[in-house]
């Protein structure tokens, strides 16, 4: 009986297994017949399906080489394990149609990946490597033959990295704060990681004790760095990714503060503080709210040459009328002085003067016979005018203030109400620039004010008919009788003999072409100091006689037009397609020339002459304060004295900095004085000078020319790969381009600078590089890349993995973009 029951049970089980097998077999046959088209079926047979001898996406697995959560910036990898339907390993070297797509969910940014078949015992594993820079949630889709693998898509969260002090900033930053004694002031700090991610998920945001604040008083004891008594508290808000530093000072005076994270100063963490009493604060508020009226302070003027805040001085610079326009530095006070003296008078004792502060200017005047005003100095109320705070003067024991605008020699003043004077100036400055000194806030203020300037002028269309074959001449002719109102209108460009209607395309093309016609060296209006097409352009001091100065006015108006169009936003945004020298940009905003401009503008001259003078003893050199000027045939044309009696004044170790700055003034500014004046005349017709003055020369370039984004596709299309084995060309180069595609614009600029010596491309992009960007297969393995900047060559060794390429390239461009690894 027992055997009978057991036999029945075995038969039933066998029957059920048989039925299951038949159902599975039927399902595979139906799937084979209905769902597999000819292309996907390939050489598979129904027998393969019956045996499960085919690649099945649902049987494959994905394993991750990291544990969640993980920080951005690292080389990440996961593995796709391929299996037949029957569970046997599927050889990955066979074509399987593996597709991996990784994208940021919120930003919709695709991440480049590399695939590599691992030579494991079963050879059924594909390693997928990638790098992410932006924190957030990512979707990872893995497909085989169009079907998702296992549980694909997968979702992974990458957290921001640790706080990087150089990326962390104060919101609404000011170089000088005006506070009230005993009243708290809160500073908003935005912690960022290396890739500018907010640290909302980072432990560093909760590490509030890592933020420190050091304050010392400015004055006679500044060298001793005396600490000041103050109260400080730090809190954080993880939702807004901000840290709040609450500061209270209990003593009046001028101080210097520095905010640090883990003993490293943050990006804009250094600033001055003026602390006023309640009564002084009310006086300053009343001064600033008084519109259009100059507030004056009694002071004593010391000899500017005694000022120690600057190591060098320049001869008097007489501003031309075009540099004064329009209505910025010279306003309501113009009528009250018969003349203006720019040369500081040699005084043995302090001179009693009066300092006037208005919304637009800060002026120093002397009164003759107590009734006749005589203007001694005028400074614009703009970020370029810097104050230095010193201790009491030796004569009257009054607090001292040094004013330096980078144009005139610094002026040293002592004043009983110095702190009120400085606070009035600072508050007026803050009103002038829109309440913040950060670049983006200044851009927003600039564009808002520029729209206000042209608000009453209609932005209706005006037709501009030009010839493509004589673009510059026809454009000059078409705009010859244009008023400022016409330049403010929306240009509708019509190219002769072309029927295209201008819905924006012809206008943008005209801006592109006219910028090239004006600022390319072939027009001879602008020139380079070196023969390299990567060099910056500067007004040409040797322009042909037929190129009239009116053309520089036209160039200035064009730049002003681009700035105005960009202020309108949207489709009107228009960048200036040019790469100007730093010294030319500095002259646009009225800055004084400095020998350091040679380093970027004329690097060959800087290396050959400037560095030689800086690094050598001048006692045995027969060098004088004069410059030899040669003609085109190389013969000496004339000798130009850099100062009165310069041909008889030797250059010594004591005055060589003074000599180099005079040389910069002559070579970079004096030789192109007329060209710059006419350029400014055209520019200031559309853009007031006081608006441009809120930027420095680097910010001005960003405002006019943009960031100059580097296009990876353009890079890849024009880069030339030289030499190399199969491993180098097929694997290392694939890893290299994947790493390059993952780099930020800042990192791409560093890579470009590492290889070419410049962080910017010519207007034509990589195609315009001469010689072309070359990637040379270096005869080394697993070492740092090197570069030959003179030949635009990147020497790339061989590597064993994507992670190694990423690590070595990152190290090279971060540590060596200014010399490390460069040849």
UniProtKB/Swiss-Prot annotation:
Pathway it belongs to?
A: Protein modification; protein ubiquitination
Q: Which spans of this chain does UniProt mark as Filamin repeats? A: 64-158
State what protein this is by name.
Apoptosis-resistant E3 ubiquitin protein ligase 1
Root EC class = transferase
Q: Where is this region: Interaction with SOCS2?
A: 483-789
Summary of the tissues where the protein is detected: Detected in brain, testis, heart, liver, lung and kidney with very low levels in skeletal muscle and spleen.
Location of the active site: 790 (glycyl thioester intermediate)
Describe the task this protein carries out.
E3 ubiquitin-protein ligase that catalyzes 'Lys-11'- or 'Lys-33'-linked polyubiquitin chains, with some preference for 'Lys-33' linkages. E3 ubiquitin-protein ligases accept ubiquitin from an E2 ubiquitin-conjugating enzyme in the form of a thioester and then directly transfers the ubiquitin to targeted substrates. Ubiquitinates SEPTIN4, DIABLO/SMAC and HTRA2 in vitro. Modulates pulmonary inflammation by targeting SOCS2 for ubiquitination and subsequent degradation by the proteasome.
Q: Which Gene3D superfamilies match?
A: Hect, E3 ligase catalytic domain, Hect, E3 ligase catalytic domains, Immunoglobulins
Q: Where is the HECT domain?
A: 483-823
**What does the record give as the reaction this protein catalyses?**
S-ubiquitinyl-[E2 ubiquitin-conjugating enzyme]-L-cysteine + [acceptor protein]-L-lysine = [E2 ubiquitin-conjugating enzyme]-L-cysteine + N(6)-ubiquitinyl-[acceptor protein]-L-lysine
Q: What is its EC number?
A: 2.3.2.26
Q: How is it modified after translation?
A: Autoubiquitinated in vitro in the presence of E2 enzyme UBE2D1/UBCH5A.
Could you tell me the keywords of this UniProt record?
A: Apoptosis, Transferase, Ubl conjugation, Ubl conjugation pathway
Asked if the Swiss-Prot or TrEMBL record annotates the protein with the keyword Chaperone, the reply is no
* Record's GO cellular component terms: cytosol
Instruction: List S-S links within the chain.
Output: none
Which Gene Ontology terms cover its molecular function? Answer: ubiquitin protein ligase activity; ubiquitin-protein transferase activity
The annotated consequence of gene deletion is: Mice show significant and stepwise decreases in indicators of inflammatory injury, such as bronchoalveolar lavage fluid protein concentration and cell count, as well as decreases in pro-inflammatory cytokine release.
Name the segments for region: Disordered.
315-345
Pfam families the UniProt entry points to: Filamin (PF00630), HECT (PF00632)
> Which positions make up the signal peptide?
none
- Entry-linked SUPFAM superfamilies: E set domains, Hect, E3 ligase catalytic domain
GO terms classed as biological process: apoptotic process; negative regulation of apoptotic process; protein K11-linked ubiquitination; protein K33-linked ubiquitination; protein ubiquitination; regulation of inflammatory response; ubiquitin-dependent protein catabolic process
What quaternary arrangement does the UniProt entry report? Interacts with SOCS2. Interacts (via HECT domain) with HTRA2, DIABLO/SMAC and SEPTIN4; in the cytoplasm following induction of apoptosis.
